[in-house]
């Protein structure tokens, strides 16, 4: 049975809250169900999670607050009202940024320099691995033993022997464009 085809009431909205945990490298998320139509980020509430489970707090004082700062369409839940909410994290006082909330600092600098028309860029790279029967996965497309040819032919390459995982990347690219990212 395909559960994506189950009809839902129009006033139900799923919002996937996404944040960076205390490792500074790992994304975490959880879904909140709103019993109302969400039209903009202003309709989203702050929410909490257990920071001790995400390397951002000690067990006795573990509530970390999620502040939605960017909302886009959810490309994974297309048959219902659904959004992704990228979030900043704050400790219990809802003022002090939690560990690895670097967006707070970047936003502060960008606001102070907004009369300067600042620019910055982000490059997203993906690294795929495949199991090779052992405990240590190898990069996708590498031979079972040894190493591939030097990168020259692969960089901005075309063809089945050079652009491995292209279908995965095209799917990710399309999902991001759909979302508005």
Region annotations inferred by a language model:
Residues 1-181:
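Glycine-rich, acidic/polar active-site loops that bind/position phosphate-bearing ligands
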């Amino acid at each position: 049975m395909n559960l994506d085809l189950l009809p839902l009431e129009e006033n139900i909205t799923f919002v996937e809250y996404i944040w960076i945990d205390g490792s500074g490298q790992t994304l975490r998320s959880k879904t909140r169900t709103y019993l109302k139509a969400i039209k903009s980020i202003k309709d989203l509430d702050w929410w909490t999670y257990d920071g001790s489970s995400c390397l951002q707090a000690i067990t006795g004082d573990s509530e970390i607050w999620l502040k939605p700062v960017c909302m886009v369409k959810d490309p994974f839940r297309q048959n219902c009202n659904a959004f992704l909410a990228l979030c900043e994290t704050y400790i219990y006082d809802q003022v002090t940024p939690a560990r690895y909330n670097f967006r707070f600092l970047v936003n502060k600098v960008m606001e102070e320099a907004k009369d300067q028309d600042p620019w910055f860029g982000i490059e997203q790279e993906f690294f795929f691995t495949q199991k090779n029967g052992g405990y240590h996965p190898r990069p996708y497309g590498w031979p079972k033993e040894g190493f591939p040819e030097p990168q020259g032919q692969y960089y901005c390459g075309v063809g089945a022997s050079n652009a491995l995982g292209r279908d995965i990347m095209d799917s990710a690219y399309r999902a991001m464009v759909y979302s508005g990212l």
